[in-house]
Amino acid sequence: MSAHLIDGNALAKQIRAEAAQRAARLTAAGHQPGLAVVLVGEDPASQVYVRNKVKACEDNGFYSSLNRYPADLSEADLLARIDELNNDPKIHGILVQLPLPKHIDSHKVLEAIAPEKDVDGFHVANAGALMTGAPLFRPCTPYGCMKMLESIQYPLRGARAVVVGASNIVGKPMAMMLLQAGATVTICNSKTRDLAAHTRDADVIVAAVGRRNIITADIVKPGAVVIDVGMNRDDAGKLCGDVDFAGVREVAGHITPVPGGVGPMTITMLLINTLEAAEREAGIA
């Protein structure tokens, strides 16, 4: 029997509709939520991501400011622009699209964003606050994954969860959110010895390591929930995740597809973070 599909597009549509209503109420009160997106260089994938984020804002009643710069923009000029956005009352969230050109220190740039406008949740103030369970913002991708688990009413308390991938953007915050939900969490990576020894006992697997087919049917517990965060290309050039979808869907209880799974939820939670920033500033959060 095939696994139940957790449809990221459908869930994102539902959450965005609710966000649009909240945004309309804010706008009517003179506080339209605003997101500034900063893109440096001409990376094709980054251009697609930025375009999707700006469109999501426009489609749901948010103000968006797209700041495009050539790849040779100096670090000092980028920091100066971020300072301007920090002080712009129309902007409630600032997103700097990664990766940045090599001559720019991405850590320094992310730390320059005011924590109350750090809607990606990457600033050390928010990353640290996540440890205590009280961040201003949760990183968008793991936040979206948690919403997907919530949508199937999965009982995380006491569940065994394995996160494959330990990045600051997904793996580490994902593990922290699962811990806070009461799960027993193991973090693995691409170099973990005997990955199967960990995943075969997992009730929930989150694959976020960026390696195609690292999760196969033979290492998944029957009935497990499998969340695929990976973004790769198969031999035909088609988008695929870290999970062997065709095989694993015959074993798992629930599974997310790629595309149409975590991706739409990531942008949706960016809207939610921006909305909450605007509500806080308006004094109604």
Curated annotation (Swiss-Prot):
NCBIfam families (UniProt xref): PRK10792.1, PRK14186.1, PRK14189.1
UniProt KW Amino-acid biosynthesis keyword: yes
Pathway stated in the Swiss-Prot or TrEMBL entry: One-carbon metabolism; tetrahydrofolate interconversion
HAMAP family linked to this entry: THF_DHG_CYH
Pfam annotation, one family: THF_DHG_CYH
Family assignment from sequence similarity: Belongs to the tetrahydrofolate dehydrogenase/cyclohydrolase family.
UniProt subunit comment: Homodimer.
PANTHER family: C-1-TETRAHYDROFOLATE SYNTHASE, CYTOPLASMIC, C-1-TETRAHYDROFOLATE SYNTHASE, CYTOPLASMIC-RELATED
Keywords, in A-Z order: Amino-acid biosynthesis, Histidine biosynthesis, Hydrolase, Methionine biosynthesis, Multifunctional enzyme, NADP, One-carbon metabolism, Oxidoreductase, Purine biosynthesis
Gene3D superfamilies named in the record: Leucine Dehydrogenase, chain A, domain 1 (3.40.50.10860), NAD(P)-binding Rossmann-like Domain (3.40.50.720)
Described purpose of this protein according to its UniProt entry: Catalyzes the oxidation of 5,10-methylenetetrahydrofolate to 5,10-methenyltetrahydrofolate and then the hydrolysis of 5,10-methenyltetrahydrofolate to 10-formyltetrahydrofolate.
Name of this protein: Bifunctional protein FolD
Domain of life: Bacteria
The protein's Enzyme Commission number: 1.5.1.5, 3.5.4.9
One GO molecular-function entry: methylenetetrahydrofolate dehydrogenase (NADP+) activity
Native species: Cupriavidus metallidurans (strain ATCC 43123 / DSM 2839 / NBRC 102507 / CH34)
Lineage per the UniProt record: Bacteria, Pseudomonadati, Pseudomonadota, Betaproteobacteria, Burkholderiales
CDD domains reported for this sequence: NAD_bind_m-THF_DH_Cyclohyd
Catalytic activity as recorded in UniProt: (6R)-5,10-methylene-5,6,7,8-tetrahydrofolate + NADP(+) = (6R)-5,10-methenyltetrahydrofolate + NADPH; (6R)-5,10-methenyltetrahydrofolate + H2O = (6R)-10-formyltetrahydrofolate + H(+)
Any GO BP: methionine biosynthetic process
Residues that hold NADP(+) according to the record: G165, A166, S167, S190
